[in-house]
Amino acid sequence: VPVYSPRQINAEPESTNKRSSFRRRVETAFIGITSADYCLAETATLVMKTVPGSDRSISLLPSIHVAVIELNQIIRNLPELYACLKYEGKPPDWGLTNCLTLISGPSKTADIELTMVHGAHGPRELYLYVITSTAAA
C-alpha cells in the first residue's frame, strides 16, 4: 500500500497517536510517494527540505520511492541550489532548513566484504515523475 506525505502533522498532544500510527504505516509500506523541492540536473539528485509537518521516512523506509516534481523545479547544480535556498525565504533564516535530504538514486553499498547490496540504507528502487504542465487541457 503506497504512503503519501500530506505535510500536515501537528505538534499537538493528541496528534502523537496519529504520528505513531502514521509511522507504523510508513514502516510497513512497500511504496512511498513524495514530492521534492528541487532536482539537480547535473547529478539527477532530488532535494527534499525537512520542514515542520514533513516526514523524511517516506523517502527512506519503503522499498520503492516514487517522487513527483514539476519541470520548473529542475535546476542546474549545487551552487544554483544554494542561491535558490538563500533567496526563497526571509532573513535571517532564508530558505535554509535544519536538514536537507539529497537523494541521487536507490540505496546501495559495498562496504561489507565488498559485496554490492541494494536497499541497505534506503529504497531499493527510485522513480521520478516530472509534470510538464498543470494547466487544464
Provide a role label for each language-model segment:
Residues 1-137:
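The feature marks the mature, well-folded catalytic cores of soluble enzymes
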